[in-house]
Amino acid sequence: MSTVLPRSSEQAPPRLSAPAAVAVSVLAFAAAVGVGHLVAGIVAPPSSPYQAVADAVVRYAPSELVEFGKSLSLPGLPRGQADKVGLLVGIGVVLLVIAIVAGLISREHERLGRRVVVMVGLFGLAAVCTSPVFALADVVAPLASIGAGLWAFRWLHHKALTLAAGGFPPGAQRAGSGRGDAGRAAGDAEDGGHSAESPGEDDPGRPPGGGGHSAEPLTRRNLLVSGAAVGVGAVGAGVGGYLLGAGVDVAASQAQVAPEIKPRSPARLIPSGADFAFAGTPTFITPNKDFYRIDTALRIPAQAAADWSMRIHGMVNRELRLSFRDLLDRPMLDRVVTMTCVSNEVGGNLISTARFSGVSLRDLLVEAGVQPGASQLYSTSLDGFSVGTPMDVVLEPDRDAMLVVGMNGEPLPLEHGYPVRMVVPGLYGFVSATKWLADLEATTWDARQSYWLRRGWARQAPIKTESRIDQPREGDTVTAGQVTAAGIAWAQTRGIRGVEVRLDGGEWQPARLSTEVNKDTWRMWVVKLSVPPGKHTLQARATDDTGQLQTAAHARPIPDGASGYPSISFAAT
């Protein structure tokens, strides 16, 4: 009697090709991201693992990296927004690389790929749990993300391996083939070679070891449909999570409160001659859509005014809890203020002016009773971002520090802090201009360190006397002869006394100033210059109302603002 060996012992176990293994892994990672985002949209948008990791990068990144990010530019995006897109895309690229590696190592052992899914998922869970706004329910999204990734990885890997094995699960094929050959040998001896119970090569339409049950083999089309379903589901889940996360109808909330933002202490009307827009300067009031935006928020916190509340606590005699209605019921102020970002380079455009409506922050602090020794007003935003403001500055009677609810006659735009933000004239935004305000604590500098202070920036950051050249622009070619130069200057709380310009290092020439609106706003300047043909360099400098001349010493933005004379090069023909 001859011996028939099982054919499975003659063949190597099926193995995924590298492209198939990578595709399986990438789709599984996409499913994990999508499901995590979807569940976060239902439970709490900040608990999306993808966003939480990005937030953690912002939270723990060194100052140099943050400044590099803010300096990035992308077509169609203003400065201060390209860094957010770049970070999110960068995290996506890193995830893609990890997914590719996980796919390749899973060719030998599928469980190794799943372990990578778990490790990445646990990293996302850690990012969620270390968020300053963490709540226990936030763990649901990262756990769902891990579960979805594991399921998708195992399911797709099994299907791809089945196809590689000829359409039937590898284990079943090997077991069935063995029994079929042995049964065929026994059948040869007993009934002429037919075995009704163990189909072999003669009956490929039935599953190996199927016990008489028929099944269709897996085809490439089946696998592609399964992969497409996972991919489309991942994208759909991600989009769904985004839409659910934006579920707060901010526009409806803004429309509801708009009629009530009516200042009882209005600012003066802007006088004629307050700008030289005809000569190339900005308009005096910056439209809301053009107002500069610099912040760390990857996803803007959205909250309806009816749901907003804030606590003033810490080193105070009486803790205050305020709703949006409480603010509206207080005397409303209206102040025109020029705001400046500390990241503004010499000659930069991170400066804007608006009419802000709100309540006196000083009055609230006096009502709470700030205790002696409280040196810092520590403010926190809805997304956990923190700012430290010198308490003595906020309490100055003439400073007009405000909790702002309106901007240029409208409710605050969402991207500029709706429902409530802080504005303290004369201080750079990083120590004063908390958006999406959620909490105020009177404390000391030793007790609390804000986001920027931990990165080596200054506690005290009054805005420096600076100027900018708006016309001509860098690289312009103008007609030789009488050339109009124009620009802006600012020294908030001190005001601008004069601006001078010089051509090619020559004598300083005084410029004509626009009408002053108040000491907290910029002033425009314009001057006629006699410019011969050739290449030229133009510089400007300002003097504030205290007589302090703008410094020529060059300084970077860190730790308390850039300085130096603005300079542009142009040609005349």
Feature locations, PLM:
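N-terminal secretory signal peptides and thylakoid transit peptides that target proteins
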Residues: 209-231
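Membrane-embedded alpha-helical segments of integral membrane proteins
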Residues: 81-105, 109-174
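Hydrophobic alpha-helical membrane-embedded or membrane-associated segments
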Residues: 21-32, 91, 95, 119-122, ...
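Membrane-water interface at transmembrane helix exits
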Residues: 36, 40, 70, 102-106, ...
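Structured, non-membrane catalytic/scaffold regions adjacent to prosthetic-group chemistry
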Residues: 109, 132-136, 151-155, 246-573
